[in-house]
UniProtKB/Swiss-Prot annotation:
This is Protein NSP-INTERACTING KINASE 3. It is found in: Cell membrane. The keyword Nucleotide-binding applies. It catalyses: L-seryl-[protein] + ATP = O-phospho-L-seryl-[protein] + ADP + H(+); L-threonyl-[protein] + ATP = O-phospho-L-threonyl-[protein] + ADP + H(+). The gene is NIK3. Oligomer. Interacts with geminivirus nuclear shuttle protein (NSP). It comes from Arabidopsis thaliana. The modification Phosphothreonine is found at T298, T324, T461, T462, T467, T478, T557. GO terms for molecular function: ATP binding; coreceptor activity; protein serine kinase activity; protein serine/threonine kinase activity. One of its GO terms (biological process) is anther development. It is a single-pass type I membrane protein. The active site is at D428.
Length: 632
């Protein structure tokens, strides 16, 4: 008996020690969380006009609940602060956040040098400091970041040379140092995409370029006494003209040679036509798979491995030879306009859209008969599958997770709309296209299959791609899409998160009539929001947050697209900034009150309230419903 007690006591002691070790892993000997200290130091050196860092509290013991901070296994793994109007400098204490995998600070006004201490972040995979006002040289310590895939330092005021140490990083996919004041030669980096445009004094890789090719200052003989009168003056003028012409010719010649070199080099960013079927050719971190590999991984595309069906194709679960689980999307239409080159160009665009809340492309397969995309497998499926299709017995998403999903999705869409080049319109934002990673972080899928948007143009199509109930009225009536089309779809997604229902399935029960959006508007006007709530939540929700999220959803789904907020504004409203003012303005008549214009060719005999269901019934365009049958 004593022996049993001793064993039980010892096991209990070991469990206690293990728990204590885990809970105090980020604590200093004085009991202070060093990650909290580092983040607060970062906050203190930044000017934060919109108070986005307000809840970064030095007295907190857990930074994982802070805005713009994400954690993995209890450690800070991501710092995402894009487009927050931040200024000031970046604290060297950021180097103490040694579990960081992603730092995104683009589109702010941060000044000063890039801290050398960033070189300590050995787990860092993505560093984006673009579109700020950083000065000084690029730290050589960045070469110590062995896991770095993406480095964006473009559009700053950096000087000096690009450090040779970057050549030591073998896994680089993208390096962008364009539009700075850099000079000298470039290191031979492994990145498939290396952007240097906008640095007038950069002279190319050491292996192929001669940095001494800058012309020496032209020296003319000093003027002496005028012995030949006008003839001598004419001679001087001719000499000056010839010298000027020679200098101009040299500049044009040098510029032409540089542009030719850039053109030749940029062609190598993608595949050479003669190599387009070479299975060994890859694009940065992307792998080019053979059809045989993917057929084997999916057991000959067995129907038992189908994860979902959509308008673009079928998604299969796959097991690669190394045991890795992947999602294999076999596209329906192999005859993409532009053929192989156009497909590869779109693959490149997808691969360069990198954000924690976007589904990362792992690889692809391309041949005359097949177009296949390979993505990481998401073990927690889609939001749609988690809301209703709990076949595997998983619990329903609780309220806090649903709000986290809303914010994460908004961040992903902000990146697509405002930080990608070219911008990308998703055109089918819905719960089935929002996937969940192992931490239940929202990951926007299928974005790369939408049409790309040039900065100057909106996309017009004669066939509307999307899911009924999610398609914006102007898209239904005219075929014209814009970023505001996605804002509308996001508003419907918020309603799906609240109700636990798919917009496409809404109206099948006896007490539901019309479409989801019209029903929500009616209940909101009647003050009966509680009827909206998903019964699986068992009344465990925040009533104030419910009201706020419904308001955001209604702002997003206004019929007039010009009245809808931008996704960056939506994100701020979800985080508690500016919603009250925007909602009040709408209610006071400065927002949308009048009925939207009717679709072309329709005449209204009398003013009346327009409902979303009217647009669905009246649309003469082809609607290709995209609906997945299961988690992806």
């Amino acid at each position: 008996m004593e022996g049993v007690r001793f064993v039980v006591w010892r096991l209990g002691f070991l469990v206690f020690v293990w728990f204590f070790d885990i809970s105090s892993a980020t604590l200093s000997p004085t009991g202070v969380n060093y990650e909290v200290t580092a983040l607060v130091a970062v906050k203190n050196e930044l000017n934060d006009p919109y108070k986005v860092l307000e809840n970064w509290d030095v007295n907190s013991v857990d930074p994982c609940s802070w805005r713009m901070v994400s954690c993995t296994d209890g450690y800070v793994s991501s710092l995402d602060l894009p487009s927050q109007s931040l200024s000031g400098t970046l604290s060297p204490r950021i180097g103490n956040l040694t579990y960081l995998q992603s730092v995104v600070l683009q589109n702010n006004a941060i000044t000063g040098p890039i801290p050398e201490t960033i070189g300590r972040l050995e787990k860092l995979q993505s560093l984006d400091l673009s579109n700020n006002s950083f000065t000084g040289e690029i730290p050589a310590s960045l070469g110590e970041l062995k896991n770095l895939n993406y480095l964006r330092l473009n559009n700053n005021s950096l000087i000096g040379t690009c450090p040779e140490s970057l050549s030591k990083i073998e896994g680089l996919t993208l390096v962008d140092i364009s539009y700075n004041n850099l000079s000298g030669s470039l290191p031979k980096v492994s990145a498939r995409t290396f952007k240097v445009i906008g640095n007038a004094l950069i002279c190319g890789p050491k292996a192929v370029s001669n940095c001494s090719a800058v012309p020496e200052p032209l020296t003319l003989p000093q003027d002496g006494p005028d012995e030949s009168g006008t003839r001598t003056n004419g001679h001087h003028v001719a000499l000056a003209f010839a010298a000027s012409f020679s200098a101009a010719f040299f500049v044009f010649f040098t510029s032409g040679m540089f542009l030719w070199w850039r053109y030749r080099r940029n062609k190598q960013i993608f595949f050479d036509v003669n190599e387009q079927y070479d299975p060994e050719v890859s694009l940065g971190h992307l792998k080019r798979y053979t059809f045989k590999e993917l057929r084997s991984a999916t057991n000959h595309f067995n129907s038992k491995n189908i994860l979902g069906r959509g308008g673009y194709g079928i998604v299969y679960k796959g097991h690669l030879n190394d045991g890795t689980l992947v999602a294999v999307k076999r596209l329906k239409d192999c005859n993409i306009a532009g053929g192989e080159v156009q497909f590869q160009t779109e693959v490149e665009t997808i691969s360069l859209a990198l954000h924690r809340n976007l589904l990362r492309l792992r690889g692809f397969c391309s041949s005359n008969q097949e177009r296949i995309l390979v993505y990481p497998y998401m073990p927690n499926g889609s939001v749609a599958s988690r809301l209703k299709d709990n076949i595997r017995g998983e619990p329903a998403l609780d309220w806090s997770r649903r709000k986290k999903i809303a914010v994460g999705t908004a961040r992903g869409l902000v990146y697509l709309h405002e930080q990608c080049d070219p911008k990308i319109i998703h055109r089918d934002v819905k719960a089935a296209n929002i996937l969940l990673d192992e931490d239940f972080e929202a990951v926007v899928g299928d974005f790369g299959l939408a049409k790309l948007l040039d900065h100057r143009d909106s996309h017009v199509t004669t066939a509307v791609r999307g899911t009924v109930g999610h398609i914006a009225p102007e898209y239904l009536s005219t075929g014209q899409s814009s970023e505001k089309t996605d804002v509308f779809g996001f508003g419907i997604l918020l309603l799906e998160l609240i109700t636990g229902q798919k917009a496409l399935d809404f109206g099948r029960s006896a007490h539901q009539k019309g479409v989801m959006l019209d029903w929500v508007k009616k209940l909101h006007q009647e003050g009966k929001l509680k009827q909206l709530i998903d019964k699986d939540l068992n009344d465990k929700f925040d009533r104030v947050e419910l009201e706020e999220i419904v308001q955001v959803a209604l702002l997003c789904t206004q019929f007039n697209p010009s009245h809808r907020p931008k996704m960056s504004e939506v994100m701020k409203m979800l985080e508690g900034d500016g919603l009250a003012e925007r909602w009040e303005a709408t209610q006071n008549g400065t927002g949308e009150h009048q009925p939207p214009p009717l679709p072309p060719g329709m005449v209204s005999s009398s003013p009346r309230v327009r409902y979303y269901s009217d647009y669905i019934q009246e649309s003469s365009l082809v609607v290709e419903a995209i609906e997945l049958s299961g988690p992806r």
